[in-house]
Design a protein with these regions (language model features):
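Nucleic-acid-binding surface
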Residues: 14-21, 54-129
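Nuclease-adjacent, charged terminal/linker segments that flank catalytic cores
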Residues: 1-72
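Hydrophobic, Leu/Ile/Phe/Ala-enriched alpha-helical segments that form helix-helix packing faces
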Residues: 34, 46-50, 85-93, 131-134
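Generic detector of well-ordered alpha-helical segments enriched in charged/polar residues
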Residues: 16, 43, 47, 86, ...
Length: 176
């Protein structure tokens, strides 16, 4: 089942849920994720969320967040990179929830779980600590815009991937 079919008529709830998990995303990313909606319908949803105080737009209108405080405190770079990865795997998602740090989100599909983990200098130690605790069937996506960071990551036997994300959302996938 595609993401569009799964969220049909529940887009408002899904947008709120995704913003609460990711913290900050780019406006263009959210529009891309919900591209199945006509512009008019998407606009109505965003207007309603804004009117009810459930969404905050940065002054430059580039980012969306659940609140101004969240927009100021969230690591934008990592949230945006992980959201690009979520867009990439959205059709595999049957359900998703906030992950245990450093994982931002865990996406469940029929046969496996996907953990989207931002790869940064600050996260490497925590990522390496959790390598033994991860179920073997879980796929670990380490998300970065700097491939030099992967040299410090301990590799599992299988199901470890690096998603190298460009500024335009272009994604290159490498097995770790």
């Amino acid at each position: 089942m595609t993401f569009a079919r799964a969220v049909k008529n529940k887009e408002l709830a899904y947008i709120s849920r995704l913003l609460s998990i990711f913290g900050v995303v780019e406006e263009r990313q959210m529009r891309l994720l919900f591209q199945h909606l006509e512009a008019k319908d998407y606009g109505k949803i965003m207007t309603r969320l804004h009117r009810e105080g459930m969404i905050y737009r940065t002054p430059d209108a580039k980012y969306l967040a659940p609140s101004e405080l969240t927009a100021m405190r969230t690591d934008r770079r990592n949230s945006v990179l992980c959201f690009w990865a979520f867009i990439q795997i959205r059709d595999k998602a049957q359900d998703f929830c906030m992950g245990e740090p450093p994982t931002i989100i865990t996406v469940a599909s029929k046969s496996t779980d996907y953990d989207l983990i931002p790869l940064s200098r600050e996260n490497i130690a925590l990522i390496n600590e959790q390598v033994e605790d991860m179920p073997e069937r879980s796929v670990r996506y380490l998300i970065t815009d700097d491939l030099k960071l992967i040299s410090g990551v301990e590799r599992r036997f299988r199901n470890d991937y690096v998603l190298h994300i460009q500024d335009d959302g272009e994604i290159e996938t490498y097995e770790l």
